[in-house]
Swiss-Prot record:
It is a lipid-anchor. This is Lipoprotein LpqB. Disulfide bonds: none annotated. NCBIfam families: PRK13616.1. Residues 1-19 form the signal peptide. It comes from Mycobacterium bovis (strain ATCC BAA-935 / AF2122/97). One of its GO terms (cellular component) is plasma membrane. InterPro entries: GerMN, Lipoprotein_LpqB, Lipoprotein_LpqB_C. A lipid is attached at residue 20 (S-diacylglycerol cysteine).
Amino acid sequence: MERLMRLTILLFLGAVLAGCASVPSTSAPQAIGTVERPVPSNLPKPSPGMDPDVLLREFLKATADPANRHLAARQFLTESASNAWDDAGSALLIDHVVFVETRSAEKVSVTMRADILGSLSDVGVFETAEGQLPDPGPIELVKTSGGWRIDRLPNGVFLDWQQFQETYKRNTLYFADPTGKTVVPDPRYVAVSDRDQLATELVSKLLAGPRPEMARTVRNLLAPPLRLRGPVTRADGGKSGIGRGYGGARVDMEKLSTTDPHSRQLLAAQIIWTLARADIRGPYVINADGAPLEDRFAEGWTTSDVAATDPGVADGAAAGLHALVNGSLVAMDAQRVTPVPGAFGRMPEQTAAAVSRSGRQVASVVTLGRGAPDEAASLWVGDLGGEAVQSADGHSLLRPSWSLDDAVWVVVDTNVVLRAIQDPASGQPARIPVDSTAVASRFPGAINDLQLSRDGTRAAMVIGGQVILAGVEQTQAGQFALTYPRRLGFGLGSSVVSLSWRTGDDIVVTRTDAAHPVSYVNLDGVNSDAPSRGLQTPLTAIAANPSTVYVAGPQGVLMYSASVESRPGWADVPGLMVPGAAPVLPG
């Protein structure tokens, strides 16, 4: 797993700092392996003198290229084996492969052992995994006039890990959140060697829709019957230099059914952020049915034109940093700490809090008799600087989290997930249970932390010291459910204490691991360690935004900012070096 973290994090960091195979002639979705294009010259090919062991390893490398139903890999097979091999569906990424042979003069039978490092779905979704590869069945090689060839192999695709790293690149698709306020990341791995084909591939994937588990958590303004009229070109129609220099990109679509301006703006945002985050630069000329998507942007859109949906913006940035100090909420003002006006600055015994994503409201948990058998907790919600209303209670309540629709999510008594809202009819607080059956069934145990992503479509939880991710789905009846739970960050073990979303694709956690007390994990499940210089353990609460991470340590709150190159370690936050102080940010 250390190798997984070391190699994959290069892709992860590239995606954070920046922010499948071919060019389909139409917008019809094309799964991995079905696109036709020439086989890249750098892929291995079988040669007459190859030993069976070498030929098998080169075959695994060749499976990294999905084009033409894995044509590069099929060159290592006999005709009958190629006809019988089913390469559809997801692929397993494997490493540390060992072959055990039984050999005769004309035939070799092989069993394969390997470590599983992850999987790659047929739409390019990569997820980490761990464990030993179950016996896939025998592999048989026979000697032919051209040398050894594979004559029998199990169905499915096994990707060589190193070759996968060299062939596939991580890009992010963006879909609209249900409220229409922002866009939601959907990372994909694509194998496109020609940079001028990448824009078409990404827009085609947008048209094909989100990954299956996101189908009911996001909106896709590029859904059918909308389709591409042809490949994405330069803004002037040229076929080379797309998105480079001042060439821009031109997307021509047809069968547009969206008429209202806001939906068209969201449609443009999906395209623009998807291309911009792939370093395909504007201006972005977007046409539909032979006319500009919006007349005022006939000459092209820029990221500034869709800045309101920027997936990298910090929620409620104007609200700044707050903290709980001695049980009350304080604000940071020019490195001075002052109690906030109103109820949240007066109420004692506050143990967890969150500022709303607009920066105008607060949700705070008050805990009486903490640690005692008769411990009692209550959730209070109100305007920042105003009065508060009790919205939930229980034996214990975890740190609250705000959604984009201004609902407060909180875990009551270790495993009951609630949404606290203001009833639109009565104006009174309402507590609505969230269906967390899928989470409890797959990951039983107490929930120790729950935080919503900045777009509100995902929930990250700490259960049994592990990071568990689930989708936030609104049912037809208007209720909410946590769906498709899966584990992230196998390399973190069971050491996680608390978590916070740094971006929509990046979670930062505190851990009981004294050597690595703070780590990152992304939506693929890839984890890496943050610097630890200057940190004292144990660490408890953590709060983050795209630029800064704050943690609660034994002596108070510390901060780490990647932008401070001259000070790469953790630094004290002036005024918050008080034992028990905890950082509070919007979210």
